Amino acid sequence: MEIHEHIIELPKKVYVGNGILSKLRDYLFQLNVLEPVLVVTGPNVRKIVIDEVAKGLNEIGKIEFIEVLDSSIDEVNRVEEKAKQLNPKFVLGIGGGKTIDVAKYVAYKLNVNFISIPTAPSHDGITSPFASIKGLGKPVSVKAKMPYAIIADINVLSSAPRRLINSGIGDTIGKLVAVRDWKLASKLTGEYYGDYTASLALLSAKHALSCTRIIHRDLKYSVSLLTEALISSGVAMGMAGSTRPASGSEHLFAHAVDLLQPNAALHGELVGMGSIIMAYIHGINWREIRNALDRIGAPTTAKQLGIPNDVIIKALTIAHTIRPERYTILGDRGLTWASAEKVARDTGVIE
């Protein structure tokens, strides 16, 4: 078998633990972080977190903060303009997935180091070298900067709204489908498939399933497990050089729903729901996925999210067009309306 060259991107350091944000100053010195530093935050980042970060940065030198409202290209352009004035050596992203997406995309465009400090374990974008930016003409991830370092404080992450934590679990469970799609594409189209990378993504999904069994009795341990799973998923993408190990037909469905009814649900909620349907089509244990999501109170039906049945069916019929170059169980032609309605009803996603 001919092996083609590809570059593996990995973080230099990953820090995970309870209360570790108080050690930020030490970590930044270990990482040789130099001024000036641009810190990108979001509107929902708690003041206590911002204050802790500011304290950790106060000996670095010139620091500037900027708050972003969403992960749109307009916000990217605004942050990039600020960055060009500052000419930072490092960009820090502090917040949820949207904030970190903007920070790492700007860091990528300017080719400067990026440090991820997530405050919500809502999806694997907090650790991956890809970003979901709205307004680029396609609802899929684009190349961004692999984090130079990740600083994940479990105390901070476990205090995030439960819905965001559940979203992260849904996003990670989706790897069960994504890897199946990747393997299928390799078999039918000859696409590169990495066994080790796929195994890493599957391990992340298995950890997420474990989270659903223990989260009610031990939130912090469960969030720690989820965080490590999200980090592993991001590393898998860095090793593969694409989102393939972490994004398949379940993500295409999620993007399709978001196109038809923007902001109807969190990304991980739609991925979780899509995973139920796509697992059914693959012929794997879709009930295990549905039961796992039910256990934590994550949505498993369109009704729970206020999404009309027709939107779900339409999304299933157009999902294969979102990334036509990415072969999945949906094939080249996708699902007919009748087939889409049947799988959605059979899995209980619509009534």
Curated annotation (Swiss-Prot):
The keyword ATP-binding does not apply. It catalyses: sn-glycerol 1-phosphate + NAD(+) = dihydroxyacetone phosphate + NADH + H(+); sn-glycerol 1-phosphate + NADP(+) = dihydroxyacetone phosphate + NADPH + H(+). The keyword Protease does not apply. Substrate binds at residues 124, 171, 255. NAD(+) binds at residues 97-101, 119-122, 128. Its EC number is 1.1.1.261. It is found in: Cytoplasm. GO terms for biological process: glycerophospholipid metabolic process; phospholipid biosynthetic process. Belongs to the glycerol-1-phosphate dehydrogenase family. This is Glycerol-1-phosphate dehydrogenase [NAD(P)+]. The gene is egsA.
